[in-house]
């Protein structure tokens, strides 16, 4: 059985008709009361019992012995036969000044394009198109009777579309030259000449340049009637009006009435007779009593009244619209637009109208899907997207990896390596990275004295095997000009997890049981790095992947060599080999201890073991946090930058003076490079090394990057802090002064404009290559576009010119969307995207185009088309090459859709994001009834619904899966949609489900 309302069984239809017809049939079948047959006969009301033979368009009036038929107002005849009266078929055209449309029993006046019907329902008034969106004109909009004209500012001329303006060219005779002389449209002709054309409704003058207005455009500028003559349009007025002195508009003549009355009556008695005669003639049954709206017959004649939103005029018959917006803005929060009989409130962009249809509420765009790639910050009426460190915002909402190495080599002195979300500096062989992570320091050999070890490994015999403790200290500064020995070991722990828990045994507790002579390993290191990675996931039941049951730990050690270790019999190379051999033995011991689960860590004074399972504190439900995490509102939160996790206090604390920490989730703070100079250090909670204080400022340098500092010499500059050298301007260029901080301080031979960089070899400005841009003057580099974006051309000046060429969208069986490349930024040139929507069986496609932005000045070089197949002859559902900010919804004319978007190398625009839904084809009639109803788009409030991503998602969810309707309560529905929208849908659905009610 089909969906209710889409078809009923024949038996059900018959039953329904029977129920509808049964009461009148039974009433007609009841015999008259026999008790009344002997009495006096009573009049039979033939009209009430349906025994008359009056025409369907006639009124039946009962009389004492019979009945009388009379045709309804608007019809003519003797009552048994009535035919429609054509009120338009007279010399007055029904009183209409433009077109008169006859309808059964009545008539209606309509106006030409560019006019609107006056409140009297007969006259036509000019519509000022310039009031809304400047008439679509780019520069100047001038209203004229029946139409409007776009004009351009000085130095521009009107393009062929008669709306946009193009800058004039001073060179050559062409359509780009201001002297082409065409009144309207200029077309390039062979041999370098031009040809003039006119807009529709105009004719080309004899001089083949000027354009003459005709009655076909804006009614020739006439308010009422227009007639074409050799001199142009000639205006005239309806008989009840006279022509104004301007020769175009019409004024109502004084004393003009539609009824024929004697104008020379002089006596009061004659006047009274006329009034009485007119009162007797006036009735609501004839021409609605002359009332505009509601008519009621009273003892003194007809009484006219007006519906809500109108006020009765002094003539007692005409209803005039009330402009509610004139009083307290109609109660609207933002905008009020008067309509005939009512008004509409609307909101500023970024706000939505609440269900009271007056109040405006900020739209929280950050609560919607796909608003921003990374972070979203909501503001009243708008929002801002932000990117994580190491990423750059492009196209308003997207984040792409920043190539830091493209600008001054990332600040690296030697090698810059870009990574996703970051970068790192590296040094050539024979150099080591300075503490500032940018400069490189030459390796000179080894220091004369040993440094305090930062890491110690202590292993001892315990229970027949080795037990190892790895202790990591903090507060030690690493030197960078020594020879080091590096080694590493990887071992596996079964049933392990990459998390730590408090150790049950500490080195202090073990020491009494491990005399010094029983120590198998006792080594110190300057650096250690531990990494943990889980093993492979194992397939489990039902094809699911179980969590790995093992983990792998890799420990990297770095040990420095010292002068005292070198002897006459063992040089530096010999010392390194001995050290490597000793370390390999130590690592074998460590590996055996780890396999026996006797490997322990001490980090920042906290003793830890590798955890088998996520541990919990005994007697508590609070989860034990991982390393570098503290509790915050019963949740484990990583300690933020500028703090570290203290194991003894079991909480995050601020880095003390003389230390810093620029990462989250750490168990120690790094020492500042000059801990002895505590007086110059910043207060606690230092986020990075630059907070340590005493650093050389931009334009300065020193051997270690700390004070005392020197100014950069002439011909050099330095934009960073804490550097050991300055950058050369190159090409022998001097600087304007000592202590220069940027290349812009270098005295170049020419200043390069944005989109260019200065080449210090040729001393010329070079255009930025594709994929780069430069927004500033006088730079010696171009910035790489973020992520996978590139530019349409070289010489780009702004990040907005970096565009992602990937075609956007997500295609699903039930819902999805298509999106122009780089949306919501401008799409790139020469794009070509193709999508195919192929819904499941017995489903159809509904598409909503909230808005689309395509440049109309490109002669349809950019377009979006939706067809059944790629063939240009296949059934086309939608095609456009223009901008439409008014939304539209439509169903596909074919069961599947082939969609293509193409752009040329000309102008670009924002493009589109078009959602779609597939629905059960049993609802086809209902969906088409809704989307084809003009009321869906009549008000701005309804239009905003089709632009609201949250509301469209809810509507599509129910259309795709009707059972999901029950996810939304009635209260939620009322809060989501305006009442007028709900009423529209309710009437459609009710008629669809109960067509026979």
Curated annotation (Swiss-Prot):
Domain called EGF-like: residue spans: 43-83, 84-125, 126-162, 175-211, 215-250, 284-319, 321-361, 362-400, 401-441
SUPFAM superfamilies listed in its UniProt record: EGF/Laminin, Growth factor receptor domain, Spermadhesin, CUB domain
The keyword Disulfide bond appears for this protein: yes
Tissues with expression: Expressed in adult heart, lung and testis.
Coiled coil location: none
Interaction with the cholesterol-anchor of SHH: annotated span: 845-854
Signal sequence region: 1-28
A Gene Ontology cellular-component term: extrinsic component of plasma membrane
Cysteine disulfide links: 47-60, 54-69, 71-82, 88-100, 96-109, 111-124, 130-141, 137-150, 325-336, 332-345, 347-360, 366-376, 372-385, 387-399, 405-416, 412-425, 427-440, 807-833, 860-881
Domain CUB: 807-919
Keywords: Calcium, Developmental protein, Disulfide bond, EGF-like domain, Glycoprotein, Lipid-binding, Repeat, Secreted, Signal
An annotated GO BP: chondrocyte differentiation involved in endochondral bone morphogenesis
Residues annotated as glycosylated: 657
The protein's assembly and partners: Interacts with SHH via the cholesterol anchor of the dually lipid-modified SHH (ShhNp). Interacts with PTCH1. Forms homooligomers and heterooligomers with SCUBE1 and SCUBE3. Interacts with VEGFR2.
Domain comment, as recorded: The CUB domain is important for the interaction with the cholesterol-anchor of SHH. The CUB domain regulates protease recruitment and activation during SHH shedding.
PANTHER family: SIGNAL PEPTIDE, CUB AND EGF-LIKE DOMAIN-CONTAINING (PTHR24046), SIGNAL PEPTIDE, CUB AND EGF-LIKE DOMAIN-CONTAINING PROTEIN 2 (PTHR24046:SF3)
Protein name per the record: Signal peptide, CUB and EGF-like domain-containing protein 2
Recorded name of the encoding gene: Scube2
